[in-house]
Amino acid sequence: MTASKRVAKELDDLSKELPPYLRHLSSDDANVLVWHMLLLPDQLPYRLKAFGLRIDFPREYPLKPPTLRFTTKIYHPNISEDGLVCLPLISTENWKPYTKAYQVLEALNILVSRPNLEEPVRLELADLLTQDPEMFRKKAEEFTLQYGVDRPS
């Protein structure tokens, strides 16, 4: 099965049973290997808004993992300033070809609520979360309110 066919099937399957933390799932008109959606975290401080997310599937998918990037700024130790997600499940060394997109999205939803302080990409945010959790939450809430997208009903 080609990457395009597998990704199209996964998109169709996921669209039929969209998890409560996702909205507006779609692919690029010209390229099914690029998905767009809104992530609606269920934990504070991120549940105050929604966040745009893009998934790029390589032509070698499922042999190579997809790339996840937030298109909405988010204050999080495992997400770079340009939105790239550091998620162990999609790292080259951990990726398994039988992993499905819905599993990746489930892992991302958990990561947003429970940051992985073992593998941060923004060390200063991981340090702040460790040393002063209340200050981290306050800054994350301010950032979320400033940059987040209104949650659809």
UniProtKB/Swiss-Prot annotation:
ISGylated. One of its GO terms (biological process) is protein polyubiquitination. It is an enzyme of class 2 (transferase). Pathway: Protein modification; protein ubiquitination. This is Ubiquitin/ISG15-conjugating enzyme E2 L6. Gene3D superfamilies: Ubiquitin Conjugating Enzyme (3.10.110.10). The keyword Transferase applies. One of its GO terms (cellular component) is nucleus. Residues 2-149 form the UBC core domain. One of its GO terms (molecular function) is ISG15 transferase activity. It catalyses: S-ubiquitinyl-[E1 ubiquitin-activating enzyme]-L-cysteine + [E2 ubiquitin-conjugating enzyme]-L-cysteine = [E1 ubiquitin-activating enzyme]-L-cysteine + S-ubiquitinyl-[E2 ubiquitin-conjugating enzyme]-L-cysteine. It comes from Rattus norvegicus. Its EC number is 2.3.2.23.
